[in-house]
């Protein structure tokens, strides 16, 4: 039996101030005449219909009539925005039939493979919010144990086609992406102005933080607007040859954003899903030449070179299929890159490097130059092997800073608070010796406890890196926060630093 076999009851729409993430949720009173116990149960899927408009949602039943009255149907904020009908409108509600594409998910769980048609239908249902979070989880888990190359190609294709697809006039569109996991590491904000100042086109779309203290979009937002639309983005790129904007507002690969929202709580991060996530967005963005940064370290996403090699081959395979020139570089992921962790602190690092400040973090400068060099080598007019020298020339001369300011002016001024957290606590060394290890995962966690990225000025300022000599009581890093509770909780956490005696051999650190 499905929703078309039952009478459709018509409560009136009420807007409920509930943030339910990406999931459509509707709330009904237990005392509502529309609530038929033999038909509706809590957390069941229902179909809402008004005229020709249809939306699927998860049903919540409440005993609190102050939230929704007996004649009302409350729509959570995401559901209200998507349904886009005025408060007080009569709406029919009925049990929802399961999406037909779930049959393919069940078959995959039992060991079969997806066809390209299966994956296309699944992604279509995902992007039209026909799947609940539980059904999305089922799809992710069904794909986690194994995925064929054919399934991966079909997944990338379907995800790229589901959103905006950008087209550019230039024959060479360069881009870069890091798989993440390393605190700081805000190289894109230095690479983009260097490459754009040279003359190549680099329309960079970036993500916001999900489990980290800052994403590139969060950090760029300290300097300029990042929530620009497609047409405005094209205008900025036409004027500046580059941009640094939030990909979510441009709507590249919307299925990926939905999948990530369920992946992260489950701790799922398979190689295939990572490749599909990244390359679907780059394919939709119109990239022709792509540089992938794979940090390797004991607390990075990739812990050894073998893992990096397997992932590299997967990126190259999919890139070749779609005609994207993919270059993969393996980088040092043993410790943070730069001194700041958190949006404001990371933005300060970026601008210090671009301004050639003598106090700027040398590791962030050097890594950015090396990555920019790889991208500049894609210019057929540039002599082979001269990419690094050209990148350094553009940075040292101030051309990159000038280009960054041009991009900032084109995107517009920031719209959020850019103050640094004024409550601080210094974490100090417990003994004399040398820093032999830094736990990236732990530092990310401490920065989030301090308030980042919600509080833009919260985070951590590092004073010591691997190989540095320290004395007992000397500050290793400083916690910044706006709330006393965040500062104190972060200060009470594990130090994240390993300190060995002078006699220890630092080469033992992977």
UniProtKB/Swiss-Prot annotation:
Entry keyword Glycosyltransferase: yes
GO cellular component: cytosol
GO biological process, one term: pyrimidine nucleoside metabolic process
Keyword Transferase: yes
EC id: 2.4.2.4
Catalytic activity: thymidine + phosphate = 2-deoxy-alpha-D-ribose 1-phosphate + thymine
Full protein name: Putative thymidine phosphorylase
Organism name: Nitrobacter hamburgensis (strain DSM 10229 / NCIMB 13809 / X14)
